[in-house]
From Swiss-Prot:
This is rRNA biogenesis protein RRP36. It comes from Scheffersomyces stipitis (strain ATCC 58785 / CBS 6054 / NBRC 10063 / NRRL Y-11545). PANTHER family: RIBOSOMAL RNA PROCESSING PROTEIN 36 HOMOLOG. One of its GO terms (cellular component) is nucleolus. Component of the 90S pre-ribosome involved in the maturation of rRNAs. Required for early cleavages of the pre-RNAs in the 40S ribosomal subunit maturation pathway. It is found in: Nucleus, Nucleolus.
């Protein structure tokens, strides 16, 4: 007990002696404590500090998520009021609040979960479909020579400009034919290589034939047009006219027959006769009554 000023019987020496005895008693009690007790007390103090920190972080995260959800809801309401005709946007407020678990760790997102987008980002008019090529990608590496904006290509001009390729094709056909006929080169080739060469030879021959027929048709029609203009200028024809498709076909067939040899005409007539007979037989089989 601390002495008062009125207490005359308690001297200063006695007061100091009492304080020293109390300190000695406290030191004796600390000396008697073990290291295990001190360690457990320290761990308890650290655990309390960690709990306080985790509670503070959780409260901060909750406040942050709640503020974000409120902002997103306000933005979505404003956008819905401004653009009533626009497509609905995905609300990401639920996803943001449920992203964190109770212990504060981030949740693992499922790969089958729907896509989440921010409500602040405006929705595009053209919906982007994953896996589908956009118009930008399709027109990014196109050749301007074949752009439809420049109009249709002039086939006559291109055929005239690249007519020299027919000579290369004919020389290639001749080299393939000699390769197949030659016995030495034929022994070196396998059956698969031989079949590939034969297919290439057949495709080249058919391509040359189609080009020759096309050139012949264009020449026949150009001659007919020239004769019409000449007759109109001379006064033999009143008005030049455009041919129908059926008239064009008849004119081309007549000109082809005139340019053919006798053996070629017979082959063509025989092919047409067989085709007509097969058509008639099919009609007869179809018209027969079923039993």
């Amino acid at each position: 007990m601390r002495p008062s000023y009125n207490d005359d019987g308690f001297s200063d020496d006695e007061f100091t002696n009492s304080i020293l005895t109390k300190r000695d008693e406290q030191d004796d009690s600390l000396e008697s404590m073990t290291f295990g007790a001190l360690n457990s007390a320290q761990n308890e103090l650290l655990g309390k500090k960690k709990k306080k920190k985790s509670i503070q972080t959780e409260s901060k995260k909750r406040k942050y998520s709640e503020s974000e959800s409120e902002e997103d809801s306000e933005d979505s309401e404003e956008e819905s009021d401004s653009d009533s005709d626009a497509p609905p946007q995905e609300n990401s407020s639920r996803g943001k609040t449920s992203r964190f678990q109770k212990n504060g760790e981030k949740k693992k997102r499922s790969k089958h979960a729907p896509a989440e987008t921010s409500s602040k980002k405006p929705v595009s008019r053209i919906r982007e479909i994953p896996g589908l090529k956009s118009s930008k990608e399709s027109t990014l590496y196109t050749d301007i020579r074949f752009d439809p904006a420049y109009g249709k290509a002039d086939l006559r001009k291109t055929r005239k400009d690249y007519a020299f390729l027919d000579e290369y094709r004919q020389s290639e056909v001749k080299s393939m034919e000699t390769m197949l006929k030659d016995k030495k080169s034929g022994q070196m080739l396998s059956n698969r290589d031989r079949e590939e060469i034969q297919l290439q030879l057949q495709s080249l021959k058919s391509r040359l034939d189609t080009m020759k027929n096309r050139d012949l048709e264009e020449k026949i029609l150009a001659d007919h047009k020239r004769n019409q203009i000449k007759g109109f200028k001379d006064g033999q024809q009143n008005n030049p006219y455009f041919l129908k498709r059926s008239d064009k076909r008849k004119l081309i067939q007549k000109a082809k027959f005139d340019s053919m040899k006798a053996s070629q005409r017979e082959k063509v007539m025989e092919r047409k006769r067989k085709k007509r007979l097969g058509k008639e037989f099919r009609q007869l089989e179809f018209n027969q009554p079923r039993h």
